[in-house]
């Protein structure tokens, strides 16, 4: 059983956490501001540079949402202080990525280039065959990285495509020729 929800979250210097009506939490920091509405049954307290999340009872739903809420608040605090970055790697001959303003243009072996405009709050940078997706909202950064990866998932036979940096692709054996 996880006990993540019981751990208090430390608030670093320069970060301000406010809990509004109906558990609407706003976190302000040097990189920006994030807000999210959490389950109103949970009790979120901000006391002396710490955030504590308490649940009203021990039902399985409350136990699950307790740990999730604590993790989401911790990610909001980390996002406004450090930010999040996901790196993608392009593997394959003729596969390239270029920046066109804020948008990214991908050439992935299709008959046409793919233009992708990132949502508000997410930045994309291209360095050679590496695409860096960064921002303060962990969910948005991960979603954009997954969307870019979906344009050309790694091929199971040769490994060509877009993959997360460090992702290991298990390659399948090709057809064996009979005698």
Swiss-Prot record:
InterPro entries: Ribosomal_uL6-like, Ribosomal_uL6-like_a/b-dom_sf, Ribosomal_uL6_a/b-dom, Ribosomal_uL6_bac-type, Ribosomal_uL6_CS. It comes from Persephonella marina (strain DSM 14350 / EX-H1). The keyword Nucleotide-binding does not apply. Belongs to the universal ribosomal protein uL6 family. This protein binds to the 23S rRNA, and is important in its secondary structure. It is located near the subunit interface in the base of the L7/L12 stalk, and near the tRNA binding site of the peptidyltransferase center. Part of the 50S ribosomal subunit. GO terms for cellular component: cytosolic large ribosomal subunit. HAMAP family: Ribosomal_uL6_B (MF_01365_B). This is Large ribosomal subunit protein uL6. The keyword Amino-acid biosynthesis does not apply. Keywords: Ribonucleoprotein, Ribosomal protein, RNA-binding, rRNA-binding. One of its GO terms (biological process) is cytoplasmic translation. It holds the Pfam family Ribosomal_L6. One of its GO terms (molecular function) is rRNA binding.
């Amino acid at each position: 059983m996880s006990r993540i929800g019981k751990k208090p979250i430390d608030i670093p210097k320069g970060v301000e956490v406010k809990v509004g009506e109906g558990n609407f939490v706003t976190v302000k920091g040097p990189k920006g501001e994030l807000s999210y509405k959490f389950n109103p049954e949970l009790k979120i307290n901000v006391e002396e540079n710490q955030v504590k999340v308490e649940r009203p009872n021990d039902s399985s739903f409350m136990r699950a949402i307790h740990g999730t809420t604590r993790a989401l608040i911790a990610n909001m605090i980390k996002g406004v202080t450090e930010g999040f970055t996901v790196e993608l790697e392009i593997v394959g001959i003729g596969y390239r990525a270029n920046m066109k303003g804020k948008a990214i243009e991908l050439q992935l072996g299709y008959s046409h280039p793919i233009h992708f405009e990132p949502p508000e709050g997410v930045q994309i940078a291209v360095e050679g065959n590496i695409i860096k997706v960064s921002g303060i909202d962990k969910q948005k950064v991960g979603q954009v990285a997954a969307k870019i990866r979906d344009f050309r998932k790694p091929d199971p036979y040769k490994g060509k495509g877009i993959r997360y940096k460090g992702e290991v692709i298990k390659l399948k054996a090709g057809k064996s020729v009979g005698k």
